[in-house]
From Swiss-Prot:
Protein name as annotated: 3-hydroxyacyl-[acyl-carrier-protein] dehydratase FabZ
Lineage: Bacteria, Pseudomonadati, Pseudomonadota, Gammaproteobacteria, Pseudomonadales
Catalytic activity as recorded in UniProt: a (3R)-hydroxyacyl-[ACP] = a (2E)-enoyl-[ACP] + H2O
SUPFAM superfamilies xrefs: Thioesterase/thiol ester dehydrase-isomerase
Family, per entry: Belongs to the thioester dehydratase family. FabZ subfamily.
UniProt cross-references to HAMAP family, sorted A to Z: FabZ
Gene source species: Ectopseudomonas mendocina (strain ymp)
Length: 146
């Protein structure tokens, strides 16, 4: 498990763009991670998306999955951003949205390592709420030295 303080060591993002609240399962040997994002009505994006019928923007669900995948990548490599390495989200394949994410939901983020080649990493990701899949995608990240 990782609390928010340890997560901040592995992700360079900060409020309001840090979208992983807690890591509940991290299996470096099995190359997978499970984390949570607690979705509050106080999220700044709900002011405009949409005030009368708030739903979490899909691009932020994708970003949350990418951040969970980034933590897994850092842990697999045994490095942190402070060591001079970053993972940039560069694309996705097989992206599907299945259900809206609403204020009060707890988003479960899962990522599994698929491959890496020439500093391009691929992860199979999914996001669920109460066990129901709301989004899935293959997330592609580029590893870059600073």
């Amino acid at each position: 498990m990782m609390d928010i303080n340890e997560i901040r060591e592995y992700l360079p993002h900060r409020y309001p763009f840090l979208l992983v609240d807690r890591v509940v399962d991290l299996d470096v040997e099995g190359k997978q991670i499970r984390a949570y994002k607690n979705v509050s009505i106080n999220e700044p994006f709900f002011n405009g998306h949409f005030p009368e019928h708030p739903i979490m923007p899909g691009v932020l669900i994708i970003e949350a999955m990418a951040q969970a995948a980034g933590i897994l990548g850092f842990k697999m490599m045994g490095v942190k951003p402070a060591d001079g390495t970053l993972y940039y989200f560069v694309g996705s394949d097989k992206l599907r949205f299945r259900s809206p994410v609403l204020p009060g939901d707890q988003l479960t983020l899962e990522a599994k390592y698929l491959s890496d080649r020439r500093s391009i990493w691929k992860f199979e990701c999914r996001a669920t709420v109460d066990g129901k899949e709301v989004c899935s995608a293959e997330i592609i990240c580029a590893e870059r030295k600073l």
